[in-house]
């Protein structure tokens, strides 16, 4: 360790720099000690130990912070990659199970379903029913008010897209509905939907079909009875 104003250092400094340096440190109350290191190339390295030690501490802290941050980012990326892989495998296992639909129909039907969705959006756009006077001018009709209502604007595009997928991708659509009922919707909601479907099917379709069948059967009986009576009357006349 040598003093900054040692002869070995002063000899290497030009006069102008020497005067400037001496003036700088003579104004300070404490003169720091400077460490001189000789390099094999002949250059000398001047450093203040206190400053070098402080910089080393900052460097070590920065390296530790960088390492911790790098490890956390790597763990986060690995965790997200595993989650994405799990979700892809879940979709393949539960929804996209039909190989033919996945390879041949999924891409074109997806575009067709997107087109059906935007068709529904166009059909329910208020500006197309007299509100903006683009296609149909004048006061909106009742049908136009119905088509441009908020429920229609929400339900019709989804219905058209869902119908398209259900028509051309029956296996994928049915698996999607089953997966949503099993893993997404609450149990009570799923039960209510199934009960409503069962009630609609039993009280609606089945009972209606039964009523129509009974009416047709009675009408057939009446028609046959009238035909028989007519034939009997004709025979009696002969």
Curated annotation (Swiss-Prot):
UniProt entry keywords in alphabetical sequence: Membrane, Mitochondrion, Mitochondrion inner membrane, Transmembrane, Transmembrane helix
Entry's Gene Ontology cellular component terms: mitochondrial inner membrane
Principal subcellular localisation of the protein: mitochondrion
Chain ranges passing through the membrane: 104-124, 142-162
Keyword Membrane appears in the UniProt entry: yes
Domain of life where this protein originates: Eukaryota
Mitochondrial intermembrane side: 1-103, 163-238
Topological region Mitochondrial matrix: 125-141
Subcellular location(s) per record: Mitochondrion inner membrane
Topology versus the membrane: Multi-pass membrane protein
Family of the protein in this entry: Belongs to the apolipoprotein O/MICOS complex subunit Mic27 family.
Function: Component of the MICOS complex, a large protein complex of the mitochondrial inner membrane that plays crucial roles in the maintenance of crista junctions, inner membrane architecture, and formation of contact sites to the outer membrane.
Subunit structure as annotated in this protein's UniProt entry: Component of the mitochondrial contact site and cristae organizing system (MICOS) complex.
Protein name per its UniProtKB record: MICOS complex subunit MIC27
């Amino acid at each position: 360790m040598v003093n900054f104003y040692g002869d070995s250092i002063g000899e290497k400094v030009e006069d102008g720099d020497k005067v400037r340096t001496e003036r700088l440190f003579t104004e300070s109350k404490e003169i720091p000690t400077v460490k001189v290191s000789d390099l094999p190339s002949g250059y000398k390295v001047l450093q203040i130990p206190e400053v070098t030690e402080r910089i080393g501490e900052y460097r070590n802290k920065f390296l530790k912070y960088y390492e911790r941050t790098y490890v956390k980012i790597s763990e986060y990326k690995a965790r997200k990659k595993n989650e994405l892989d799990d979700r892809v495998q879940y979709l393949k296992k539960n929804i996209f199970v039909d190989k033919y639909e996945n390879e041949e129909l999924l891409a074109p039907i997806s575009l067709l379903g997107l087109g059906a969705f935007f068709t529904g959006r166009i059909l329910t756009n208020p500006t197309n029913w007299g509100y903006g006077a683009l296609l149909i001018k004048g006061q909106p009709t009742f049908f136009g008010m119905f088509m441009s209502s908020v429920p229609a604007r929400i339900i019709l595009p989804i219905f058209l897209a869902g119908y398209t997928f259900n028509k051309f991708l029956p296996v994928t659509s049915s698996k999607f509905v089953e997966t949503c009922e099993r893993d997404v919707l609450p149990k009570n909601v799923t039960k209510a939907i199934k009960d409503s479907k069962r009630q609609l099917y039993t009280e609606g379709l089945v009972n209606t079909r039964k009523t129509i069948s009974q009416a047709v059967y009675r009408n057939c009986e009446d028609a046959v009875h009238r035909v028989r009576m007519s034939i009997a009357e004709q025979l009696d006349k002969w």
